[in-house]
């Protein structure tokens, strides 16, 4: 059987992984096998952390809305219940932004919903 010279293809594949792992510590950035394993772990962690970030932002928005709504003597859960009952489905992100940045606008909306 004749010898197959892989040429630049294998080198390009390894370099791509090494470039991805260039900021990793120790052998994880130097040795190909360790870098390959670390890249897989990094991508898995990145996926999980994107999901956790969504969860954390939702909790933050709810906390901000709750703090703003309690000023009017209503809890967050009652506020959301009244909001859906009045068929005004604003998402939590916009409500939290209104509560922090546009307080007069949020107060008119909350008074209409609660009343």
Swiss-Prot record:
One of its GO terms (cellular component) is ribonucleoprotein complex. Keywords: Chloroplast, Plastid, Ribonucleoprotein, Ribosomal protein, RNA-binding, rRNA-binding. It is found in: Plastid, Chloroplast. Its main location: plastid. One of its GO terms (molecular function) is structural constituent of ribosome. Pfam families: Ribosomal_L20. GO terms for biological process: ribosomal large subunit assembly; translation. Belongs to the bacterial ribosomal protein bL20 family. Binds directly to 23S ribosomal RNA and is necessary for the in vitro assembly process of the 50S ribosomal subunit. It is not involved in the protein synthesizing functions of that subunit. This is Large ribosomal subunit protein bL20c. The lineage of its organism: Eukaryota, Viridiplantae, Streptophyta, Embryophyta, Tracheophyta.
